[in-house]
Design a protein with these regions (language model features):
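Short beta-strand/loop segment that forms part of the nucleotide-sugar
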Residues: 8, 32-42, 63, 93
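Active-site beta-to-alpha loop of glycosyltransferases that engages the nucleotide-sugar donor
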Residues: 8-22, 41
């Protein structure tokens, strides 16, 4: 398997962090690495847990991103570090237990088959969502329908954060020019990748305690109608 790095922003995940790291490290891959990205927002023992695990395993590398302005900037900083360290495959996933480590192999398999981007879907056949408030399900599924209509895409899930990319796809993007700083980032990424060789795979999503604020919804709608115009600033000529 080509060198694969998992990028996962984490903050205040002391109750789940060790379990997630252990599950990933138990996967049967010699060339799979974990890059948890943490910032000043995290106030509990999450950083300590990661550092202790990194002392025991060279496959774990903590990235402390002091310039972070939110989870999306941590994702993008993780991508930069993964590219710098020679990753051929980059996987993005949640570090708090919402995404299941046991589903990582299907992303690797599809990249090895030649796909450029692999997107996890909660809403396609065999996908599933649990422990998520009804209004969040409606917003996610309704947001997917609206995004597909406005952007001309045809995906079952436009807002999932479990996804994977070949190195050259991320290298072609200006990672400093994404519009989104919140939930809309996933939709923005899928839109930019629509003309590459992509595929969706079913995932099981376990909801957490985070809430979705009205401001996030209005920001998402604003950005949605700017993406087509903004796209030319993303790809490096």
């Amino acid at each position: 398997m080509k060198k694969t790095i998992i990028v996962m922003p984490v903050a205040n995940e002391e109750n789940t962090m060790q379990g997630v790291l252990n599950e990933i490290l138990a996967l049967p891959y010699d060339n799979l690495y974990i890059y948890p990205v943490i910032d000043n927002f995290s106030k509990d023992r999450t950083e300590e847990i990661i550092r202790n695990t990194a002392l025991r395993s060279e496959k774990v590398k903590l990235i402390f991103y002091r310039e972070s302005n939110g989870v999306i900037s941590c994702y993008l900083e993780g991508f930069r570090q993964a590219l710098k360290d020679g990753a051929e495959f980059i996987i993005e996933m949640d570090g708090g237990g919402s995404h299941l480590p046991k589903e990582i192999p299907q992303f690797i398999e599809k990249l090895e088959e030649g796909y450029d981007c692999v997107f996890g879907s909660r809403f396609m056949k065999n996908g599933n969502v649990s422990n998520l408030p009804f209004y969040r399900r409606v917003l996610s599924s309704g947001g997917t329908i609206l995004a597909n209509f406005v952007l001309g895409t045809h995906l079952a899930d436009m807002t999932s954060g479990f996804e994977a990319f070949r190195r050259d796809i991320l290298e072609r993007m200006n990672l400093d020019h994404f519009l989104s700083t919140g939930h809309m980032y996933q939709t923005e990424m899928r839109y930019y990748c629509r003309n590459f060789h992509t595929i969706e795979v079913p995932i099981h999503y376990i909801g957490g305690t985070s809430s979705l604020k009205f401001k996030s919804v209005t920001e998402a709608l604003r950005i949605l109608f700017q993406l087509k115009k903004h796209e030319k600033q993303i790809f490096i000529q």
